[in-house]
């Protein structure tokens, strides 16, 4: 792409939007289930119990120590499926991009999202982009929907908690929230904490296998 910043033209359905989708999003997210020429994905559900979830991400700043809004969107969605006893399989992605966002930053974030999706074993199979007028968004908002298949051996859920159960956490409590807070540089705080945003599926699988 020759443009350096997002303009309203990237959201009007014409050539600029096509270039944005083909040369940035599709280049990083390409897979055998993603067809950018249609507005829906055809999926095989394999006659298994399906679990799905949806989430939105508006974190500021968009990039922070240990992660960014792209990897966070994947981890947040796939982890919701994992802790519900599902193995994540597919994602949809909606990107609400503010006019003026640097395309280089957008590409870093989408590349990070694609890498996180590959690591989690999921495919982005459908998506949409919208461009917001300058001042109407925080640079980039992402919305995702995730689909996973319930693992027969993963009977997880809040309703199964009993007295005497052990509480398992995946790391130090609060690392992600504090790292984002430090990156905002609003309160004169300093530190070297990094976000611990990560895929927890290996952890949930280890509980029952």
Predicted segments, located by residue:
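Helix-biased detector of long, well-ordered alpha-helical tracts
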Residues: 1-208
């Amino acid at each position: 792409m020759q443009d350096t910043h997002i303009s309203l033209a990237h959201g009007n359905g014409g050539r600029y939007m096509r270039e944005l989708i083909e040369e940035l999003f599709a280049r990083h997210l390409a897979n055998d289930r993603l067809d950018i020429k249609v507005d829906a994905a055809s999926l095989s559900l394999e006659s298994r119990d399906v679990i799905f979830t949806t989430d939105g991400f508006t974190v500021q700043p968009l990039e922070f120590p240990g992660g960014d809004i792209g990897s966070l969107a994947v981890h947040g969605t796939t982890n919701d499926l994992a802790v519900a006893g599902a193995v994540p399989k597919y994602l949809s992605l909606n990107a609400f991009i503010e006019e003026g966002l640097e395309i280089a930053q957008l590409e870093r974030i989408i590349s990070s999202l694609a890498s996180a999706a590959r690591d989690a074993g999921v495919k982005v199979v459908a998506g949409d982009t919208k461009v917001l007028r300058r001042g109407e968004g925080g640079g980039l908002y992402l919305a995702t929907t995730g689909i996973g298949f319930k693992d027969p051996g993963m009977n997880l859920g809040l309703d199964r908690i009993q007295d005497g159960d052990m509480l398992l956490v995946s790391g130090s409590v609060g690392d992600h929230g504090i790292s984002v807070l430090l990156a905002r540089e609003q309160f004169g705080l300093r530190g070297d904490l990094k976000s611990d945003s990560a895929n927890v599926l290996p952890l949930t699988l280890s509980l029952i296998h």
